[in-house]
UniProtKB/Swiss-Prot annotation:
Belongs to the bacterial ribosomal protein bL20 family. One of its GO terms (cellular component) is ribosome. PROSITE patterns: RIBOSOMAL_L20. Keywords: Ribonucleoprotein, Ribosomal protein, RNA-binding, rRNA-binding. NCBIfam families: rplT_bact. GO terms for biological process: ribosomal large subunit assembly; translation. GO terms for molecular function: rRNA binding; structural constituent of ribosome. It comes from the Bacteria. Binds directly to 23S ribosomal RNA and is necessary for the in vitro assembly process of the 50S ribosomal subunit. It is not involved in the protein synthesizing functions of that subunit. It holds the Pfam family Ribosomal_L20. This is Large ribosomal subunit protein bL20. The gene is rplT. InterPro entries: Ribosomal_bL20 (IPR005813), RIBOSOMAL_L20_CS (IPR049946), Ribosomal_protein_bL20_C (IPR035566).
Amino acid sequence: MARVKRGVVARRSHKKVLKAAKGYYGARSRVFRVAKQAVIKAGQYAYRDRRNKKRNFRALWITRINAQSRAEGMSYSRLIAGLKKAEITLDRRVLADLAIHDKPAFAAIVAKAKDALAA
């Protein structure tokens, strides 16, 4: 079997990793062995946090909705129950946006939820 000289392939592979590690601190951006580990770990963090981001935003939306709905005299859980009963299908992202930027519209939605719970 012929000998395989890896010069070009190895150089390309190293360049790819070092380019991905650009901006990292110290040896993590300069030494291939360390940079490779850093890039792999960064990928793991990115994968994990793309999922956590969804949870964090949902929690933020719920906090905002709860704060505004309490100002309107209703707890978050009662509001969601009222919306389900009134068959209003607005997701939490939209509700949170209304709670922050369009308080009169949010107040109208809370009023409808209250009516649905009273009925």
